[in-house]
Amino acid sequence: MRLLSSNSMTRSVLRGMTLGAIALGVSATATAQDPEEWFTLGGDFAHTRYSPADEITAENFADLEVAWEWDGASFKAVSGRSTPSLIDGKLFTVAGNKRHVVAIDPKTGETLWSYREPDTPRGEYSMRADYGKGVGFARIDGRGVVYIASPGFFLTALDADTGVPIEGFGQPVPIDGFPRTGVVDMLADLGHPYDPYEGLPLETGYITSSSPPIVVNDTVVVGNSAEQGYHQSRVENVPGDILGYDARTGAFKWKFNVIPKPGEYGHETWENDAWEWTGDVSSWAPLSADPENNLVYIPTNSATIDYYGGFRPGDNLYGAALIALDTRTGERKWHFQMVKHEIWNFDNPTAPVLLDLDMPGRGKVPAIAQITKQAWVYAFDRITGEPLWPIVDKPVPASIVPGEVLSPTQPHVTKPAPYDMQGITIDDLADFTPEIRQQAIDALANYQMGPLFNPPIHAGNDTGKFAAMNCPGGAGGANITAPAVADPETGKLFVSSHKACFALRLIPGEEADLLYPNTTGVTLSEWANAGPGATSRPPRHPAGIPLWKPPYSRITAIDMNTGDHSWMIPTGETPNRIKNNPALEGVDVGNTGTGALVPMVVTKNMLVYSDAASDGTPMLYAINKETGEIMEQIEAPARSSYGMSSWVHDGHQYIILQTGSTLTAMALPGAQAQSSGGH
C-alpha cells in the first residue's frame, strides 16, 4: 500500500500561471482562413471552426438539401466523433474502433482510399478506440502527408494521394503485417518497459490516443489519453507525456513531462512520491497552435482516479492545466492550472480557441480562450500567458473523506461571467409551481448541495447524505461533444453548454474494484467512484422533469474583446416530455432548451447549430451572430455530434454533419452530385 507519512501532508502551493522566456510577436497565421480548406478538425490551428464561405445565406438556408452521405458502416463507424479535414480537394477522416484512415471525394462522397493499421492487443484494449476525432496534415516538399495517432499508440504518415505509408518515415515495427516504413512506435519514447505487440503491462498503466496529432511547422505534436478516471480503483498509472517528432522523418525530437520529475518545475506539487507511480495527466482533448510563434497549446486532464486523490497530496501540476510549449524544443513557455488537486472530473475538454482581439484601452492582443466543464472561459495573452482579466484564488470547501486533503483555494475567473449554472442551492431548483418546487427540494434531501467546488462524499459519512451534488458535473458545462466556435472577424466566442449535475459518492476501493475489471495498476485506492459510470445515482424529480430551472441547454455569445456576454439563447425546442407533462398543465414553461450540447459552425453569414424540435425531429438552425435570433430552421437527416464543418468545393458551400456512422453533406441544389455516396 502507498502510505502517507505525517510530513507528506504539508502542502506546497504554486501560482497557477508562470512564465518562461518568450519572444514577443502577434500571429496572423493561427486564424488564417481559406474557404476551400478545413485544415484541422477545428478548421484551423486556432480551432475557431469558422469558414469565410458565404454562398449559404438566411434567404436560401431553407433550400439546403442532402448532397451526399458517406456511410462508414464497412469501417464499423459508430460515434461520429471525427471532423473531416478538407485539404487539396480531398476530405480526410478516421472511422471505427480500428481508426481506419479514409480519403473521400468532397463532391460525391465516394471513398478514394483507406488505410488500416494491423491488429494488436495494445490497440484492441484501447478504451478510446472510436475516439479518433480526425487527422493531422503537412506538406513535405510539395507532397501532402496525412498523420494519424492510432488506438495502439502508433504514429503513421500516409501519402495523401494514395494512402500508402511514407517511405523514410519512422522505423520498422517488429510486428507482422506492419509496413516497413511510415510508422513510429510512440510507446518507445515514453520510457516505460513494454512489449511492442502487447503494449504496457496493465499493472504499470495504459496509454492510447483520442485526438489527432497536430503538425506545427516541422514538428508533429502528439497528445494522448488513458482509461477514463471514473473507471479506476487502483492508484498506479503512467503519465501521458507530450511527444514531438520530426514531420519529415518521424525522428523523436522531445518529450514534455506532464508530471514533473525531480529538479523540474512543479515537482514539489506531488507529495507522497506519487510522481513515481501514478499518472493519467495527459491531453485527451485536441491541441491548438500558433505556428508563427512556434507555440502549441496543451489542455490537460486530471491525475489518476476521478473524485479521490488522497494518495497524491499536493496541487498535482500539470493536471487540469493549459500549457504553452515551444514546438521546436518542447520547452514550457507558460502554463496556468485551472484546478489544483483536481478531483471533480474538471479536465479541460476541448482545444483552446485562439483569437486576435482589439481590446478597449489595450489595443491588439493575441489571445487564447479555454472553455471548461465548470462553465468558465479562462482567457490569456497567448504569447505571455498573462490573464486578460484577473483570475483570483478564493477559498473552497474542505473534504470530509478520510485521507483526502484538497487545496484550500481554487482559481476563480472574474471575467467573462460564467456561461451556465455553477453550484446548486434551493434557489436554483425548478419552481414552475409550488408543488414542483417542494418535490425538487424533497428529491435532494439526501444529497449534499453546495458551490462549484463541492467535494465528493463517501459511503457511511457522518452527514448521512448519499452523495454530493456537483454542478456542473463531469459532462459540463461545456464538453468535447460540442466544441466552442468563434468568429475571428469580430472576436465573438460561441459556447454550447448544458446543466448536467453529477452526484459524487465514494465507496471503499475494494468494492469499487469489482465494478472495473481489467483496470490499470495493482494497489487499491482507499476510496473510488461508487458508480459504474461517471456519476452515482442522481436524484430524480417525481414529475420526470429536470430538478433545476431552465434553460437546460444554451448557446452563449461572448465578446472576447470586452469579456461581456452579447446574448444567450436556449437550444432546440422544449421536449414534449416537458411541454406535455401533466404536472405542468396550464404552465407556460417557455423554451427550456432540449438539454443537449449542440455542435456548431460559424460562417461569414451565420452561426449554424444542430439540435432537435419538441418531438425529437433533428433540426438545423441558422442564427444571427449579432443578436442570437433564429433566421431560419430546417429539418435535417440526423443530429450532428462532436462537431460540424463548412467549406467550399467546386464553387459551392457545404455543411458537413457528423451523423453517427455516416457523414452527411448539406448544400444548395446547384451543388448536388450524381453519386449517392461512398461506403
Predicted segments with their positions:
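N-terminal secretory signal peptides that target proteins for export/translocation
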Residues: 1-12
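N-terminal signal peptide c-region/cleavage motif recognized by signal peptidases
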Residues: 25-27
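N-terminal pre-domain segments of enzymes
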Residues: 32-55, 409-418, 424-438, 442, ...
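Mature N-terminal segment immediately following signal peptide/propeptide cleavage
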Residues: 32-75, 86, 556
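Repeat-blade elements of multi-bladed beta-propeller folds
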Residues: 38-42, 77-100, 126-154, 205-234, ...
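Extracytoplasmic/lumenal domain signature
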Residues: 59-73, 101-125, 141, 155-203, ...
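Long, low-complexity segments enriched in small/aliphatic residues
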Residues: 288, 410-502, 510-511, 554-557
